[in-house]
Amino acid sequence: MIQMQTCLDVADNSGARQVMCIKVLGGSKRRYANVGDIIKVSVKDAIPRGRVKKGEVYNAVVVRTRKGVRRADGSLIRFDNNAAVILNNQHQPIGTRIFGPVTRELRSEKFMKIISLAPEVL
């Protein structure tokens, strides 16, 4: 459950280490984002010579949450951290690698690139 001011780890090699959610996209009254939702983020910590710089604003998709994802069979998949993958304006990932597991809920037409790059899909 991600809301404004939530800090997330970055699960790709775009150069950012940590980002902060500045808006949950999808309507003015929308408060929370879950796995698979697109949010607007600001880069808070970045490595030198990365593709992104501190202070820049990007779209990102949430790939892991501590709140977890409830499946239809009743199971709950939780993670140790909140993580996102940074996207460009065409909603394609900026990085070329994904770190850590992602959930099957990302398996829509929009995020198949993230699924194919991920080392593990739960």
From Swiss-Prot:
InterPro entries: Ribosomal_uL14, Ribosomal_uL14_bac-type, Ribosomal_uL14_CS, Ribosomal_uL14_sf
Organism: Methylococcus capsulatus (strain ATCC 33009 / NCIMB 11132 / Bath)
HAMAP family, A to Z: Ribosomal_uL14
PANTHER family tied to this protein: 50S/60S RIBOSOMAL PROTEIN L14/L23, LARGE RIBOSOMAL SUBUNIT PROTEIN UL14M
Cellular-component GO terms for this entry: cytosolic large ribosomal subunit
CDD domains per the UniProt record, alphabetical: Ribosomal_uL14
Designated gene of the protein: rplN
Function as written in the Swiss-Prot or TrEMBL entry: Binds to 23S rRNA. Forms part of two intersubunit bridges in the 70S ribosome.
Protein family per UniProt: Belongs to the universal ribosomal protein uL14 family.
Quaternary assembly: Part of the 50S ribosomal subunit. Forms a cluster with proteins L3 and L19. In the 70S ribosome, L14 and L19 interact and together make contacts with the 16S rRNA in bridges B5 and B8.
Pfam family, one: Ribosomal_L14
The protein, known as: Large ribosomal subunit protein uL14
GO biological process, one term: translation
Gene3D superfamilies: Ribosomal protein L14
PROSITE patterns: RIBOSOMAL_L14
Transmembrane regions: none
Gene Ontology molecular function, alphabetical: large ribosomal subunit rRNA binding; structural constituent of ribosome
Keywords assigned by UniProt, alphabetized: Ribonucleoprotein, Ribosomal protein, RNA-binding, rRNA-binding
